[in-house]
Curated annotation (Swiss-Prot):
The chain crosses the membrane at residues 200-220. Residues 221-248 are extracellular. Interacts with A151R. InterPro entries: Virion_mem_poxvirus_L1 (IPR003472). Essential for viral fusion with host endosomal membrane and core release. It comes from African swine fever virus (isolate Tick/South Africa/Pretoriuskop Pr4/1996). GO terms for cellular component: host cell membrane; membrane; viral inner membrane; virion membrane. This is Inner membrane protein pE248R. Residues 2-199 are cytoplasmic. A lipid is attached at G2 (N-myristoyl glycine). It is a single-pass type II membrane protein.
Length: 248
């Protein structure tokens, strides 16, 4: 963790968010033949390496219901942070329990900026049809690709200010924590030791206060017991003096 830099880019964060949204919506997306369309008209046309990557059918009512579920944003933020970890982007857990870690910062960023309406709109954009039409004679079409997958969600996110704010915030958060751990490994260790030492000192103070309390209670009870013994001894002494006086 220390001594190595793990910079996260805006593009990488955008891809992670779009992939996470796509994965969260898997139950609403099904494969459907014939959704994309390639039309070739004429004679002598040559097509090489023409691909249709993904044919999709989207259940929009399922999408609407899914994004409005109470735990949707939480599940989405969990998947985004997990994807960041899987791509070896440093996610530092801070030693001080009172400080927000990256995961908390990312969750707050998503909840504020990545609205369910935006997510629903971007997922719904998957239902568009890709069309490739070639007309005439003697045309050569090579390396033509029709993509209808996470890239569409990614393009949609890049067209939204809220999504851009989310992506920028997550990218900066990851890089900020990564910079902290990589800038000076010994500073990180020193902070960790300081946090542990601080906790030990607090525990020691509590123990000392408990011991002082026990001593105070013991002293109070002991003094009270001696006082009671002295009060009981005074009548006995007086009676003894009276008896000696009578004998005399």
């Amino acid at each position: 963790m220390g001594g190595s830099t793990s910079k996260n880019s805006f593009k990488n964060t955008t891809n992670i968010i779009s992939n996470s949204i796509f994965n969260q919506m898997q139950s609403c997306i099904s494969m459907l033949d014939g959704k994309n369309y390639i039309g070739v008209f004429g004679d002598g046309n040559i097509l090489n390496h023409v691909f249709q990557d993904l044919n999709l059918s989207l259940n929009t009512s399922c999408v609407q219901k899914h994004v409005n579920e109470e735990n949707f944003i939480t599940n989405l933020s969990n998947q985004i942070t997990q994807n960041l970890k899987d791509q070896e982007v440093a996610l530092t857990q801070w030693m001080d329990a009172g400080t927000h870690d990256q995961k908390t910062d990312i969750e707050e960023n998503i909840k504020v900026n990545l609205t369910t309406t935006l997510i629903q709109n971007c997922v719904s954009s998957l239902s568009g049809m890709n069309v490739l039409v070639v007309k005439g004679n003697g045309n050569i079409v090579e390396n033509a690709t029709q993509k209808q997958s996470q890239q569409i969600i990614s393009n949609c996110l890049q067209g939204s200010k809220q999504a851009i704010d989310t992506t920028t915030g997550i990218t900066n958060t990851v890089n900020q924590y990564s910079h902290y751990t990589s800038k000076n490994f010994f500073d990180f260790i020193a902070d960790a030791i300081s946090a542990v030492f601080k906790n030990i000192m607090v525990a020691a103070v509590v123990i000392v206060l408990i011991i002082v309390g026990f001593i105070a209670v013991f002293y109070f009870l002991h003094s009270r017991h001696r006082h009671e013994e002295e009060e009981e001894a005074e009548p006995l002494i007086s009676n003894k003096v009276l008896k000696n006086a009578a004998v005399s």
